[in-house]
Amino acid sequence: MNRTLASIGAVAVVSACSMGSSMTIVDNATLPEPVRVPAGQKMKMAATGVGELTYECREKANAAGAYEWVFVGPVATLYGGDRKTVGKYYAGPTWESSDVSKITGKQVAVAPAGAGSIPLQLVKTDPAMGAGAMSGVTYIQRVNTKGGVAPSTTCDAAAKGSRQQVNYQADYVFYGA
């Protein structure tokens, strides 16, 4: 049984069978309130996502001549505690298990993470497509984020339409009622 401590509260990683991943036990009381799962939710599984977030240089809405990097979408591989691939995460947002069951969802809330890291996040999921590991998942937390913020390179008229990928990593914790 593997045990580690993560940067946000005390998070233990314990071997488990769900999705072939390690289960991350998250003490919601240690997380910022906006990204805590509602009462009655139970952790079903967890995975670490490693991949890239794509940003595109676009003109700011209602600000002619001003530009900014805009998030386009993610592409990540989901790994279990044994470091084996257990699924993938991509635009939608969509989390797809290796058993091809998948879920989409909508962001409920975010909370700041460490400098240079994308925010922590809480997502309310839609019903799963396909039977499998994603069946019954109702919420997903993104915690322990590393990297992934918009590029620091210049975004101006000359760069308009250009895209850049930024490396990131995060733990995804899946819950069901």
PLM region spans:
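Bacterial N-terminal signal peptides that target proteins for export
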Residues: M1-I8
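Primary mode marks residue(s) on the alpha4-beta5-alpha5 output face of response regulator receiver
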Residues: T24-E52, A61-A177
